[in-house]
Amino acid sequence: MQQKEIKLQEEEENRILEYLKFREKKESPQSTKEKEYVTDAKKIKGTYTDFSKAISIGDGYILLQSEAQNQVEKLQKQTGIKYARIWNILSKEHCFSEKDGYNFRKLDQVLDFLLDHHLKPYLELGSKPSLFMYTPERSINIEETKTSVFDFATFSEIIQEVCVHLVNRYGVDELETWYFEYWNDPSLHSFEPDGEYYQRFDLLYQTMKRYSEEISVGGAGFILGYESMACKNIFEIWREREIHPDFLSFCSFQYIALIEEGERIGKKSIDSEYISNQMQIMKLIMQEAKFEIPELHIDEWNFTISNRNILNDSCEQGAYILKNCIDMNGQVDIMAYWHALDLYSDYYDTDTVLNGDSGLISRDGICKPSFYAFQFINRLCSKVLGKYENAIVTTNGRNHFVIACHNYKSLSSRYVFTDEDEIQLEDIEQYVEDIEPIKLNFTIQNVQNGKYLVKTYRVNRASGSVQDLWKNLDYSKGLMRDEVEYLKSSAIPSIEMKTIEVENGELCLTNNLEMQEIRLIDIQYQYNV
């Protein structure tokens, strides 16, 4: 057994050494894995929707900071995000005190900022804690004062006050385009038929519907893979009640629930189809409970809940996002990635340019591979010609084709047994199943003959990865302003342009992708005078 483990370790080390040799020569390793993707330009297979154009920001009042505003504005402009999910909007610190009453001025500033920058609010109205996570078992409640749950009488009063304020300030038509969610706080006992959660949800629902039946109110942020069995009981309770949510919301972090010594704990999962598989399980549970809700949201999703997992900063995260945005199209109505900005978890230990947080933009405003994954998704056309394991092929139906593709590598068993905040930068390759490149051959049939301009955008360890650029700076702490600006301007996708000519109605392209690489291929017919 020991000899077998030594042999496997040697094989793994040899693969890594081979990969590094190619990296030094600035070449791509030869692909041993090859896939053929053939589509027909005349056959539309489906639609790519805007379901993934949502982001969880966290505590809404972070948007009072100019730094956060600048980064969110950049995020919206370059990725096309449409919904911004925020919580703690009813915090005692910012808008309510039992002594002085209500003051919604700061809330108005937050909402005005979102609307001024073409973002629709997705409002979580519960008392959701702002947790700083090292691992699922180790967290810090950064601001305890914000998370106390109002008693029912106070909650009832403040909900009615804030709802009438929003209607008067923004109008019913505007509020019909927002989402209002109420979180399943464990202290409200939704697993009991007379649990206070349902009373509070009904109050919020009835208050909003008083102004318009078209205002969307839902809940309750159930955790996929962790609360699945509890959900059957909750759905059966909810089914028997008069008021049902307009949408059900879920969180997806790649963990499964295990019972150890009588306690339920979360263990990391390496299922590469985790979100899709867990969502299918949840749909079956809904069917069994005879609780059919037409709209399903995943309002927080990531492979990790940790704010200190260096894979968040790596090319792995870009490939993970692109893969899941492709896979989940058509399965849910909204997916809001967790989360937007590293500023959310800016803490005493954030003394380096990257800290393993899951924001799309670093605290210094540097875009990560995860940011570019959403940028690539935003450029897809709406008509789908083909959806595959490693790619999606889209068109506008007028000689314009856009392909997004990836070489996502699943996490390895070694990842399962390593604390997330203990993964080292130099060991990243050891936490994926393999480091093999892939060759993707695309053929689009029945296209118009003539010349096409092909633009290829790449994000890999040589282009668009701030983590790998930082390596060239020796992972130094306390970078000077010009060094941060260098990273900011250099961590961008590479671009290649070429013209190809089609003579037989078939457009053929070959792409070799290294591990965790993502690409966007924009193909535009060139008309003659």
Can you say where each PLM-predicted feature lies in the sequence?
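Substrate-binding cleft and catalytic face of glycoside hydrolase catalytic domains
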Residues: T79-I270, I281
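Aromatic/acidic polysaccharide-binding cleft in carbohydrate-active enzymes
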Residues: I298-Q424
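Carbohydrate-binding surface patches
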Residues: N390-N472, L513-D522
